[in-house]
């Protein structure tokens, strides 16, 4: 009979007691509070977008550097820049009247 009493004690201990339930008062959100919450969400989203823009640009630049250009293309662009700069300097010097 001791075994039966121990089983009864264990089952009584292991059973969770039912919590008493209380009514919860629910209030509707005021329009002003809702607008303030939406403004906060919009501000957070815009801040996040501005923070991610430089990161996205940097990732694109890294991808472009990883792909690379042939040396002849880089030399061609450098020559074009030099010719343009020299031409512009000759025009400015010629129009200065010296």
Curated annotation (Swiss-Prot):
Keywords: Chloroplast, Electron transport, Membrane, Photosynthesis, Plastid, Thylakoid, Transit peptide, Transmembrane, Transmembrane helix, Transport. InterPro entries: Cytochr_b6-f_cplx_su8_sf, Cytochrome_b6-f_cplx_su8. One of its GO terms (molecular function) is electron transporter, transferring electrons within cytochrome b6/f complex of photosystem II activity. It is a single-pass membrane protein. Residues 1-67 form a transit peptide. It comes from the Eukaryota. The chain crosses the membrane at residues 72-92. Component of the cytochrome b6-f complex, which mediates electron transfer between photosystem II (PSII) and photosystem I (PSI), cyclic electron flow around PSI, and state transitions. HAMAP family: Cytb6_f_PetN. This is Cytochrome b6-f complex subunit 8, chloroplastic. The lineage of its organism: Eukaryota, Viridiplantae, Chlorophyta, core chlorophytes, Chlorophyceae.
């Amino acid at each position: 009979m001791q075994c039966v009493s121990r089983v009864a004690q264990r089952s009584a201990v292991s059973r969770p007691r039912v919590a008493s339930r209380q009514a919860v008062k629910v209030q509707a959100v005021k329009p002003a509070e809702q607008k303030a919450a939406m403004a906060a969400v919009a501000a957070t989203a815009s801040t996040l977008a501005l923070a991610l823009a430089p990161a996205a640009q940097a990732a694109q630049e890294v991808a472009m550097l990883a792909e690379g250009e042939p040396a002849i293309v880089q030399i061609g662009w450098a020559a074009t820049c030099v010719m343009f700069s020299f031409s512009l300097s000759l025009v400015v010097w010629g129009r200065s009247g010296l």
